[in-house]
A protein has these predicted regions:
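Extracytoplasmic c-type cytochrome modules immediately beyond a signal peptide or single-pass transmembrane anchor
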Residues: 27-211, 225-246
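The canonical Cys-X-X-Cys-His
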Residues: 212-224
């Protein structure tokens, strides 16, 4: 689906996600429910950062073919993931749950970029709406179509920051965001996890908090209420504020 047709559906987060891994997933070490969730979040963050770093290129009206193909973004995302994991490249060939989920995720990354080549390469158009938040949402939707019975990745945020109705937190997420991730004593960057139902099914749920960086403030900073480039009012956020959750 063309991003140009969906500019008004920009999600709030250039920096966030909520992740659910359904049972049964019990394993040891780096194949635990928790580690699978963290790895999926890390891969999504890695791919999203590639799109973020290429915003100037994507929105350059003077360039047609940007060379930013699905294969290029996928490869760069894997490189960033590997660096974030201390040099451990993802295993995308095994049949265990983690490998299957990561493989489906990198395939979704490739597919979304390929589906939006016309938008990315459209000449004589500056802002195209193919921003990290929209990219992440489309990747999550593609991933869910293929792996929704086993895992789900979602980008959400505190309710007052939600711009896209699809990203609204459910009741469990709202409670965890308000009572844990937003609590004064919560260690910044600490991940929240718990066994809790999702849509009537048992699941292991992991919330990875993300905080506004300087680059987020162009759309989510001050002055509060001023319209950003997407046409949404800014939230008045500051660097370090909780901006969302994977």
């Amino acid at each position: 689906m063309s991003i140009a047709q969906r500019i008004r559906v920009l999600a709030v987060l250039l920096c966030s996600l909520s992740l659910l891994v359904s049972f049964p997933v019990k394993a040891a070490d780096n194949n635990s429910d928790y580690d699978i969730a963290i790895d999926l979040a890390t891969m999504l963050q890695s791919a999203r950062s590639v799109i973020g770093e290429n915003q100037e290129l994507i929105n350059d009206p003077a360039i047609g073919d940007k060379g930013l193909t699905g294969a290029v973004v996928q490869a760069r995302a894997i490189e960033k993931y590997t660096k974030a994991k201390g040099g451990a490249a993802p295993d995308l060939t095994s049949d265990d749950l983690k490998s299957r989920l990561l493989r489906a995720q990198v395939e979704a990354i490739h597919q979304v970029v390929e589906d939006n080549q016309d938008t990315i390469n459209q000449p004589d158009i500056a802002f195209k709406g193919f921003v990290p938040a929209v990219f992440a949402r489309l990747v999550n939707e593609e991933f869910q179509r293929n792996m929704g019975e086993e895992a789900e990745v979602k980008v959400t945020a505190p309710p007052e920051l939600i711009r896209n109705r699809k990203a609204r937190p459910d009741d469990w997420e709202v409670e965890a965001i308000r009572n844990d991730l937003s609590a004064p004593g919560w260690e910044k960057g600490a991940v929240f996890s718990a066994e809790a139902e999702k849509d009537g099914r048992p699941a292991f749920r992991v919330l990875v908090p993300e905080y506004y960086g300087q680059g987020c403030l162009a759309c989510h900073g001050s002055p509060k209420g001023e319209l950003d480039v997407t046409g949404y009012p800014k939230e008045g956020g500051k660097v370090g504020d909780l901006g969302g959750v994977i």
